[in-house]
Amino acid sequence: MNVGHIVSVIGVVVDVEFAPGQVPDIYSAVKIRTEDQEDKSTKWNLTLEVAQHLGNNRVRCIAMSSTEGLKRGMKVVSTGKAISVPVGRPVLGRLLNVLGEEADGLEPIKAEKYYPIHRPAPALVDQSTKAEMLETGIKVIDLMIPFLKGGKIGLFGGAGVGKTVIVMELINNIAKQHGGISVFAGVGERTREGNDLYHEMKEAGVLEKTIMVFGQMNEPPGARLRVGLTGLTMAEFFRDEEGADTLLFIDNIFRFTQAGSEVSALLGRMPSAVGYQPTLATEMGQLQERITSTRKGSVTSVQAIYVPADDLTDPAPANAFAHLDATVVLSRAISELGIYPAVDPLDSTSRILDPQVVGKEHYECARGVQSVLQRYKELQDIIAILGMDELSDEDKLTVARARKLQRFLSQPFHVAETFTGRPGKYVSLKDTIRSFNEILAGKHDALPEQAFYMAGAIEEVMENAKRIEAGA
């Protein structure tokens, strides 16, 4: 047994000295347990991860849980391997922490297989190059930013514009329709949201096909930095061993970066731009490159990415952009209009919005909607200064249509029924394209624009218009 002892504790960073020639490897796990200590009055079961070799047989470790009460001289045992977490069928339907330990108060997990959380990304030759669209039932996403099956999708937005609500709705729509295995990694987010999600999924009956891994806001940075890898490792097992199409939801990638920044400062690394860690791009790459689809199976990931101060050029969101197949940008200006989901259809992009993949009709419909909205955006300055009366008849019609399209891009969500008081709507891609084509063709120019707000397909808009007329 390889035993060392603590020589210093600074917050969550612990320096440990081992015997010469017995120094554990980088990324290997070391443990502080009650049975190894002389003083057994305090219960200890603390896992740390080796982050640096300091020389003189000393290593610098990051704790995965609270270091309160640690003293110099306490014994530390090296496990000789990286943090390993249970994988496979026994983990389904469970709520776990960063170490793969049960956090739902149910019986212990009896898993046959354990995987280390640090694993190489699949080789380029093993990766899949198939392009197929994944239907979500959310109009603005399916039409303007189609998701790639087995791709990486990022939801970018500042505080309070609805990232988590969209992630929840996607879980509701895709996990229920898809019927496959879903993994949810809660990285540094609110405990309340995790609790709500757990109970919602339990009620919806999708929990037995879901694994939930949490490293919440109140946990040390070590746990928040590694919980994304824990969730990913569990998803990789189903992709590689069972050839399954797995869904991976991560909320929030920014907190992963933030935890890395905290740890980096404690390790004494020189900060880079905006105070972030110098290894930001490497850390992001190590996580993102593993989220991929192979010839055996796929991992489709949906990642919420907080944008500090609504600045998309901040290094944390900017670094994530390069790895994604589709970027859904949520706009505060749109949320202020009361249009939810507050997706900016002009700023968001998808790699597969291409006639070769989605078909000519879908592509032309999406580009038609974009061009009307873009023209409206250009005219807004003129409207603000001179008013609507100064516009040509053609531009007046464009503005009227754009306002209808903008409102029609809103949609009532199943997970937000308690807030909106409206039943959620799942709109098929076929209905979405048909509805938008009719608006672009001018078939519904006579309908009032408020009829388009929070509707499903175009038939519901017509019903709303009749109701408004009857009420008037």
From Swiss-Prot:
PROSITE patterns: ATPASE_ALPHA_BETA. The keyword Magnesium does not apply. F-type ATPases have 2 components, CF(1) - the catalytic core - and CF(0) - the membrane proton channel. CF(1) has five subunits: alpha(3), beta(3), gamma(1), delta(1), epsilon(1). CF(0) has three main subunits: a(1), b(2) and c(9-12). The alpha and beta chains form an alternating ring which encloses part of the gamma chain. CF(1) is attached to CF(0) by a central stalk formed by the gamma and epsilon chains, while a peripheral stalk is formed by the delta and b chains. One of its GO terms (molecular function) is proton-transporting ATP synthase activity, rotational mechanism. Coiled coil: none annotated. The keyword Iron-sulfur does not apply. Transmembrane segments: none annotated. Gene3D superfamilies: 2.40.10.170, Bovine Mitochondrial F1-atpase, Atp Synthase Beta Chain, Chain D, domain 3, P-loop containing nucleotide triphosphate hydrolases. The gene is atpD. GO terms for cellular component: plasma membrane; proton-transporting ATP synthase complex. It is a peripheral membrane protein. It is an enzyme of class 7 (translocase). Its EC number is 7.1.2.2. ATP binds at residues 157-164. It comes from the Bacteria. InterPro entries: AAA+_ATPase, ATP-synt_VA_C, ATP_synth_F1_bsu, ATPase_a/bsu_AS, ATPase_alpha/beta_chains, ATPase_F1/V1/A1_a/bsu_N, ATPase_F1/V1/A1_a/bsu_N_sf, ATPase_F1/V1/A1_a/bsu_nucl-bd. Belongs to the ATPase alpha/beta chains family. The lineage of its organism: Bacteria, Bacillati, Bacillota, Clostridia, Eubacteriales. It is found in: Cell membrane. This is ATP synthase subunit beta. Keywords: ATP synthesis, ATP-binding, Cell membrane, CF(1), Hydrogen ion transport, Ion transport, Membrane, Nucleotide-binding, Translocase, Transport. Produces ATP from ADP in the presence of a proton gradient across the membrane. The catalytic sites are hosted primarily by the beta subunits. It catalyses: ATP + H2O + 4 H(+)(in) = ADP + phosphate + 5 H(+)(out).
